[in-house]
């Protein structure tokens, strides 16, 4: 008798995705982040669901309802901090996952890569709207500043911003719609992630060497299921440490002050995972130019496949490109630091130089390095 997991219509899908999936035998720990992102997403949906049961999306009670969750709901503080810090862990995994894709040439699977970029934008939008919900000072002013950027769009900008706000400022209507979107988007992300996997399984996984691995495939289970479980346990340990020892480490103290439209915080800044993009935005004195640079800083990922000049797929055997890649990582860390600093000398010029370097590495230096490496190998 044939095994039910290979014949049942539903079980067959699961079997072909997580059990009998032929997987390259040499994929490293950098390939763990895909499954970790799945774990993070499920965790965020579950904790978010329980938070939504006690949260009220109203300007007068939102801040109090979050306080109520932390003080009065059984283990409410755990749920709240797992959700808040879970977002940070989510973004760490995201950056690692995208970095892996850049390093090993995974962007040469165009459908998977493009769905990934859409996922990245959707997750960033979801995280931004989630940050507004506690209705603290940084929630309110962050929402005001970031939504206001849309007013830089010629002709329709102002109308567009007021349409998004649902009034003439960030107010009750804005909070209500942000809650609605923040609730629905994770389920859209879940569907997109399924499509992302669907396209990945059309081609099979890439591997560190960048050469076809059809001759050496192993079943996903038990080899990679156990590896993914280990990754998930390490993720859980990291998150638990963060939640139980320093839950506010990555947050902003200003968000413990209820939102006040009459008092602007001294330094308005988003969550740490947006600081690199915020630094790029601030490094351009012109409003529209800054907004375009901000969007392009992420959208640039979409043209990476077109800029691939090397005859090798990954960077495993390309020392020049490796140096540029790690320079890019250092540059992004610098931008993250600058994004959290006030707009004054010397931070302005450092931010501008780091922004120029970011685009130069991706658009100019990496393609040139690929050509040089081809010539060095006489290819």
Swiss-Prot record:
- Just give the chief location class: mitochondrion
Coiled-coil residues: none
Give binding positions for heme b b566.
97, 196
Check the record and name the InterPro entries matching this protein.
Answer: Cyt_b/b6_C, Cyt_b/b6_C_sf, Cyt_b/b6_N, Cytb/b6-like_sf, Cytochrome_b, Cytochrome_b_C_euk/bac, Cytochrome_b_N_euk/bac, Di-haem_cyt_TM
Annotated membrane-spanning segments are 33-53, 77-98, 113-133, 178-198, 226-246, 288-308, 320-340, 347-367
Ligand binding (a ubiquinone) = 201
Q: Which PROSITE patterns does this one have?
A: CYTB_CTER, CYTB_NTER
Gene Ontology, cellular component aspect: mitochondrial inner membrane; respiratory chain complex III
Where, subcellularly, is it found?
Mitochondrion inner membrane
Q: Which Pfam families match?
A: Cytochrom_B_C, Cytochrome_B
* PANTHER family linked to this entry: CYTOCHROME B (PTHR19271:SF16)
- What else is noted? Heme 1 (or BL or b562) is low-potential and absorbs at about 562 nm, and heme 2 (or BH or b566) is high-potential and absorbs at about 566 nm.
Q: Partners and quaternary state? A: The cytochrome bc1 complex contains 11 subunits: 3 respiratory subunits (MT-CYB, CYC1 and UQCRFS1), 2 core proteins (UQCRC1 and UQCRC2) and 6 low-molecular weight proteins (UQCRH/QCR6, UQCRB/QCR7, UQCRQ/QCR8, UQCR10/QCR9, UQCR11/QCR10 and a cleavage product of UQCRFS1). This cytochrome bc1 complex then forms a dimer.
Indicate what this protein is called per its UniProt record: Cytochrome b
Q: What is the lineage of its organism?
A: Eukaryota, Metazoa, Chordata, Craniata, Vertebrata
């Amino acid at each position: 008798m044939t095994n039910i997991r290979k014949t049942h219509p539903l079980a067959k899908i699961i079997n072909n995705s997580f059990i009998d999936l032929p997987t390259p035998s040499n994929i490293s720990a950098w390939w763990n982040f895909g499954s970790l992102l799945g774990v993070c997403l499920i965790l965020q949906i579950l904790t978010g669901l329980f938070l939504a049961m006690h949260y009220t999306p109203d300007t007068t009670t939102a801040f109090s309802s979050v306080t109520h969750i932390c003080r009065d709901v059984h283990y409410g503080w755990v749920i709240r901090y797992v959700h808040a810090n879970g977002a940070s862990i989510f973004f760490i995994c995201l950056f690692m996952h995208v970095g892996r894709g850049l390093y090993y040439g995974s962007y040469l699977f165009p459908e998977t890569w493009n769905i990934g970029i859409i996922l990245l934008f959707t997750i960033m939008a979801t995280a931004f709207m989630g940050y507004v919900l506690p209705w603290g000072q940084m929630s309110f002013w962050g929402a005001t500043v970031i939504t206001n950027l849309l007013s830089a769009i010629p002709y329709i900008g102002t109308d567009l911003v007021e349409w998004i706000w649902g009034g003439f400022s960030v107010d009750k209507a804005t909070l209500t719609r942000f809650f609605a979107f923040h609730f629905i988007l994770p389920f859209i992300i879940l569907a997109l992630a399924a499509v992302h996997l669907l396209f990945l399984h059309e081609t099979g996984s890439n591997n560190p060497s960048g050469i076809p691995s059809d001759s050496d495939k192993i079943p996903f289970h038990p080899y990679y299921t156990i590896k993914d479980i280990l990754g998930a346990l390490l993720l859980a340990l990291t998150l638990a440490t963060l939640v139980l020892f320093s839950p506010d480490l990555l947050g902003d103290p200003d968000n413990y002050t209820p939102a006040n439209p009459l008092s602007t915080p001294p330094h308005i800044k988003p969550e740490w995972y947006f600081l690199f993009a915020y630094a790029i935005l601030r490094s351009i004195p012109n409003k529209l130019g800054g907004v375009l640079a901000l969007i392009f800083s992420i959208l640039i990922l979409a043209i990476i496949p077109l800029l691939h000049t090397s005859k090798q797929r990954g960077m495993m055997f390309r020392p020049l490109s490796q140096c540029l890649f790690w320079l890019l990582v250092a540059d992004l860390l610098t931008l993250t630091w600058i994004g959290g600093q006030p707009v004054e000398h010397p931070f302005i010029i450092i931010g501008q130089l780091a922004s120029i370097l970011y685009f130069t590495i991706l658009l100019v230096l990496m393609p040139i390095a690929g050509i040089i490496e081809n010539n060095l190998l006489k290819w």
